[in-house]
């Protein structure tokens, strides 16, 4: 009975400490004095640029493409860093997580590996359960009985630094009303590295959830992204996606079998197939205005 009480005490203390730490990470303490020579107001009051109205009759051609944004590429680092929240910036994953868990302005959708059509809405408790787990195999020395080790569950949380890729679902289309080939992102899905029960890497990816991109745009428009060479002209996450300031590769295109590239190509052939799909879109646009 005594050991049970000690175990419960350690569990409660550890949970309280970790919860307090998590709150500090998610919401850093505001500074006593302004951190800068002027007050930044442009980003926090910005609004996402409305999409141009699109009629079905104006879409002459369209193709759905699924991409992968690898955050290990240098051009994609503004989406990955900072790995810890600071006063004026967050990583893309922290922005999504805060908006989903704290503000409720972004909806997450479950079963990302088999469904990307935003059908299985997740509650806040389901999101929290997905991102947080407890390791019940951890032990700690009994403070009242030195030399004796007892169970001490450890909280494991999926942090921003663990998210290394994103799936992007988007539609390319030709609008004859404006005579332009345009693209609109439909959804984003963060990926983490899949690990075994012992914590070893498997080399595979684990999809967390899908978010509907148009719903994310107002949130992204108010979050700064680091810009090299000039801190006074920083962009937002909305700018990054609107201006296509990221690198990616194609993992799937709309097809009769609904297959991903890796299901029928491997290795170098898969890379070449990805480039072929990208080139097909480029050639289509080029041929439209080639005389």
What are these regions (language model features)?
Residues 11, 157, 177-179, 200:
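Residues embedded in well-ordered secondary-structure elements
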Residues 187, 210, 228-232:
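Short, low-complexity, polar/charged sequence segments that are solvent-exposed and flexible
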Residues 161-163, 183-185, 206-208:
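Extracytoplasmic
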Residues 180, 185-203:
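Extended serine/threonine-enriched, polar tracts that run as long, contiguous segments within proteins
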Residues 23-177, 195, 215-291:
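A domain-level signal for the mature, folded cores of soluble proteins
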Residues 1-30:
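Bacterial Sec-dependent N-terminal signal peptides
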Residues 205-218:
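Short secondary-structure subsegments characteristic of cysteine-rich extracellular domains
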Residues 169, 189, 212:
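Residues in well-ordered beta-strands of folded domains
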């Amino acid at each position: 009975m005594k050991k049970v009480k000690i175990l419960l005490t350690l569990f409660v203390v550890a949970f309280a400490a970790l919860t307090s730490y998590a709150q500090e990470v998610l919401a850093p303490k505001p500074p006593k004095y302004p951190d800068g020579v002027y007050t930044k107001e442009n980003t926090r009051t910005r609004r996402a640029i409305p999409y141009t109205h699109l009629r079905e009759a104006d879409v002459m051609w369209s193709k759905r493409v699924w991409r992968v944004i690898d955050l290990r590429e240098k051009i994609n680092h503004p989406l990955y860093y900072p790995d810890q929240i600071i006063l004026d910036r967050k990583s893309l994953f922290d922005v999504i997580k805060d908006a989903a868990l704290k503000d409720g302005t972004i909806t997450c959708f479950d079963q990302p590996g088999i469904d990307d059509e935003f059908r299985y809405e997740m509650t806040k408790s389901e999101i929290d359960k997905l991102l947080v787990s407890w390791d019940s195999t951890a032990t700690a020395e009994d403070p009242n009985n030195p030399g004796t080790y007892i169970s001490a569950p450890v909280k494991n949380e999926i942090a921003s630094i663990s998210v290394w890729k994103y799936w992007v679902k988007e539609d390319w289309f030709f609008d004859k009303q404006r005579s332009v080939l345009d693209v609109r992102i439909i959804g984003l899905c963060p990926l983490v590295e899949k690990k075994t029960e012992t914590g070893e890497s498997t080399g595979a990816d684990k999809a967390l959830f899908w978010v509907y991109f148009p719903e994310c745009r107002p949130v992204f428009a108010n979050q700064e992204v680091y810009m090299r060479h000039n801190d006074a002209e920083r962009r937002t996450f909305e700018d990054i996606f609107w201006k296509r300031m990221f690198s990616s590769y194609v993992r799937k295109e709309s097809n009769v079998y609904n297959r991903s590239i890796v299901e029928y190509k491997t290795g170098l052939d898969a890379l070449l197939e990805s480039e072929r799909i990208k080139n097909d879109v480029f050639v289509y646009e080029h041929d439209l205005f080639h005389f």
